[in-house]
Every structure is written in structure tokens, then in C-alpha cells.
Amino acid sequence: MEKVDIFKDIAERTGGDIYFGVVGAVRTGKSTFIKKFMELVVIPNIENESDRQRAQDELPQSAAGRTIMTTEPKFVPNQAVSIEVDEGLEVNIRLVDCVGYTVPGAKGYEDENGPRMINTPWYEEPIPFHEAAEIGTRKVIQEHSTIGVVITTDGTIGEIPRRDYIEAEERVVNELKEVGKPFIMIINTVQPYHPDTEQLRQSLSEEYDIPVIAMSVESLRETDVYNVLREALFEFPVLEVNVNLPSWVMVLNEGHWLRQSYQEAVQETVKDIKRLRDVDRVVWQFSQYEFIDRASLAGIDMGQGVAEIDLYAPDELYDQILKEVVGVEIRGKDHLLKLMLDLSHAKIEYDQVADALRMVKQTGYGVAAPALADMSLDEPEIIRHGSRFGVKLKAVAPSIHMIKVDVESTFEPIIGTEKQSEELVRYLMQDFEDDPLSIWNSDIFGRSLSSIVREGIQAKLSLMPENARYKLKETLERIINEGSGGLIAIIL
């Protein structure tokens, strides 16, 4: 990621105002970090000569030893400066140097009268040093910063050992987490690549769940600054996560078990995404589901806080669902092609009566209009009307008429006493409330109730005589072709 992209993305997330709140314990190198940051990134990009000189004059002072140098909060520069990072891309930058949390061994936060009193921009009266550190940290991050930077150390930069910084370090991190702004941690060390430093970096990152970078602030380079910005960018919240399911899964009905499983997995997993940094971890979590072969990050828009994730299903799952949908096991490509041909033929036939079927279900009567291919045209015939002549064109086309008829089937077994009948009713109704359809599976005299009823309905359907069917067809033809609206039916 180039520096222009980093600044552009951060500017989008912060509204163009990149304000760093630099916090931490005393004697960790906060002022040195601000000074180096300004000299490397900000001051060289200030076009106005007077603004550049003013920013140079307002750089904080830093020195080695145990004596505290920053005794009051300081804005660097005092007024935010606008720098042009690239053509058409201007950002406002300002850093805030906070009063550090006190640590054992540091000098300068007490005088002969007790705790040293500090002047702050937030109170007219001076307040004690430790109070200025706590209030200043919260106010700087909450009101004057878009990004927080916690500076700590492994103890190699001065005379104060690492153990003396731990309590102050924990207080700062907890304070920042309460505020809720994105922040990162820098370990200021003279040995950034030493195994012990790397071990400390990893342990702090795991303990605080934030990005931790080990570097020598005194030897800060421009690439280090952009690394800090890049890591800070990943701490911004995710505003939108788009998860793309396999295309063939999206074809399934919303109520299908597999599609529901995917949707539940997405809902369960993406709820853990809060920061851009969480996206990679969530992508890995998706891969743990048995119905997801793999997941990949399709793209991430740092500036907009939008992530896009692609999910892929196992090939064997596709075969399983295909078998489930088609109803038969697919034995190979030839078998699949034959099934597709059969289904294609069936679909052509079904499409001709689909509207009629829908009508008959809704109203009890449906008509399937004939297709052009079904029409037969008789030979044109000359006709005469008085002194005038014309041509008679006659076409015949079959139309399919569907009538919904409710067929009743009654089953009345005579089994004995009234008590025995009551027991049969209880037996039939025992699971009816939980599963009404279960009554059809009830066993009556060695047969299921469904088979008995089905047999009764089938018997009634076959009772309609052949000549009655023909007469019914003939009657419909006359009504339609002759336009008769009246019908008298006599059933013998």
C-alpha cells in the first residue's frame, strides 16, 4: 500500500482530519515520536513558508534520562496544518503530546511542596501531575484525536526498567478502550529485531488485542511512519460486510436447508467483525464449516470500511444437492445429459398447461390455450352471401380444460363395542396435535390409513363411465364453439 493510498483511506475515515493523540507513560519517547513524525512526514509537505517555520518552532523538546520533559499537554503544531499528499488530496494533520502517566524512578512530577501542579487547556487552575495525565489522556483521545498512539518501552531506551512501565501501560490501554477510538501501540526500543523484543511484542498484542509495533523512535524512518499509519488504518471499524454465497446455492429456495445453513453461518460469523483487522480472522472461521470448502477475501475498501468475502462450496456437496433436487443419483455426465433431455421435454409439456393448472387451483376451472403448432387449418373455401362472395378460413385447435372436483372417501370400520371405538379414536389422535399428517401413517387392520383412503378415492374416479366422459367433452365443445351460455345437466 503506497503512502498516498494510506493517507487517502485514513482521510476518508476521518473526514480529512488526521489528528494523532500520542499517549502513554512518562519517559517512553512520546515527544521524540512526535518530533520525528513532524520532521519526516508533515513539515516537508507544508507549502506555506511561515506555516512550515511555525511548525518547526513548535516541535517538542526531548532528552534522555529520568527527568520528565513534557509537563503540560501540547498541540503540535498549535493549529492543524493542511498538507497536500497528492494532487487533489489535502489532509489536516496535528499531533497532541500528552502528559504521561507517572512511573517509579521518573523525576519531575513532584517538587518540594509535593505533587507538581500542571496547567492544562481544560481547567483555569493548575491540577496535580497524575490527574493531568488521566484527564488529558481521555480528553485528547475523545475530543482532539481521530487516531490514538500508545508509546511504551521495553526498558532499553533509558534507566527505568520495563517492569516499572507495566501498570501505567495497562491504565492507558484501558482508558483508550473505554473511549472507543482506533489506536495502536509502539514499543520504543533500541533493539527492535531482538527475539526478546519480538516475544514482548507478541505477548502485548495478544493481551490487549491491538496491533503492536516494535521500533526505535530515535531512529524513526519514513517507512516506519507509514507502517504505523497502515496498522492504525486496520483498527477503524468495519461499516459493511458483503458475503457472496456460491452462485448455485443462491438458486435454491430460501427455505432449503443448505441455503439456510449458509445464511446462519454468515450471521453467526460476521457478528464478530468490528474492525478491519477482524476480517482476515473471520475469513478463516468460515472455512471451519463442513459445507464451506474455502473462503477468500474478495476485496476491502479501507476508506469506506467495506469488506467483501467469497464463499466456495465443496464439489461433492453440489452432487449431493443435485441428487436431492432431481430425485435420482447421477451416475455420470451421460446420465445427467439424459435426465436434462427428459426434464426439458417435460418442461415443454408442462409450460403448455402451467397457466391452466394455476387457474384450476385458484378457481376450480382452468383452460390451456392451444399453441400455434397444434392448430390445423382447413383448405380455404369460397362462400356466397347473396350477390357477394367471400372466403371461409377454418382452423381447429385442441384446448385443454381442467376441472377441479373434490372427491369424498369415507372409511367406517365396524370394530365392536363403543369402548373399542373410543380406543381407536384415541389411537388415531395421539400424535395429531404435534403432527397432523402423522394420522395418515396410522395402522388400521394391517394397512396404513392413507392407502385405504387413496384406494377409496381411486375407486370413485374410475366409476365415471366412458360415455359420460365423452358427453361431457362434447358438451364443452358445443358451449365454446356455439357460444351458448346456458347449460342444463340431468344426472341419471
From Swiss-Prot:
Q: Which GO terms describe its biological process?
A: exosporium assembly; spore wall assembly; sporulation resulting in formation of a cellular spore
E.C. designation(s): 3.6.1.-
UniProt-recorded name of the protein = Stage IV sporulation protein A
Catalyzes what? ATP + H2O = ADP + phosphate + H(+)
Q: Which Pfam families match?
A: SpoIVA_ATPase, SpoIVA_C, SpoIVA_middle
The places in or outside the cell where this protein is found are: Cytoplasm
Which Gene Ontology cellular component annotation is one that this UniProt entry carries?
spore wall
Keyword set, alphabetical order: ATP-binding, Cytoplasm, Hydrolase, Nucleotide-binding, Sporulation
Say if the entry is tagged with keyword Transmembrane helix: no
* Top-level EC class as recorded in UniProt: hydrolase
- What CDD domains does the record tag this protein with? Ras_like_GTPase
Superkingdom: Bacteria
Upon gene disruption, the observed phenotype is: Defective in formation of mature forespores. Fails to progress beyond very early stages of sporulation. Forespores lack the germ cell wall or cortex and the mother cells are filled with swirls of electron-dense material.
The reply on keyword Transcription regulation is no
Reported function: ATPase. Has a role at an early stage in the morphogenesis of the spore coat outer layers. Directs the assembly of the coat and exosporium to an area around the forespore.
Which ranges belong to the motif Walker A motif? 24-31
